[in-house]
Amino acid sequence: PGSTAGMELSLLRSFEPPDAAVLEDAELFAGKVEGTASGLLGLLGIAADALRSREHLLLSQILSQAWASGKGLDLAAIIGAIQEPPFEKVGVIELETFYPKKDRSDLAVAVNALLASPAAAGWARGEALDVARLLRTTEGKPRVSIISIAHLSDAQRMFFVTLLLDEVLSWMRRQSGTSSLRALLYMDEIFGYFPPTAAPPSKRPMLTLLKQARAFGLGIVLATQNPIDLDYKGLSNC
């Protein structure tokens, strides 16, 4: 992602709605919305609390409403929705009281700066993030896909890893249960993505995968130089 080396992967082409299996599971759907909103705000340098930040709550409601109606959003559409949201209230509070238009314009400008940045052009190029295509060729043959994020900034890495794990989770939900190994997800240098105390956007989908993946034939291998950096809830599922 964000590089011309190897096979390019698009990060920002579009935020497509999740599969039916995720849409029908309230917990998974809420988690996907939260992770996407947190990752995008992280790219903007906004450390947003999912329960208290008005930026996070506004963006989450925009994504949730669009995805629930089956619509995907690109960054341009998100900017438009921030400026003129397709709803009048956030919770029970009037939109203009909760997040005045002038303040929303500041957020829209920040997202637009991300869209206009030279790096964004690289993120928009390449194939869409499709786990099925990463695991198998168009002829159906298994393959190994190695994704390099060493060239990305910390915020960009977190954003991409969160998107990738959510896509793996969606792909997993489409599979039938099996006791055989169907696929393997290996992640090196897990430090910072699954910490014992903090809750970065990548932690939620990773914990869900560690709890449920084996039932769908998905194996997970995490590598770190210091196991104490991993949340014990994940280690208990090994």
Where are these predicted regions, by residue range?
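P-loop NTPase motor domains
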Residues: 1-211, 215
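Conserved ATP-driven motor cores of ASCE-family P-loop NTPases powering translocation/secretion/packaging/pilus
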Residues: 208-237
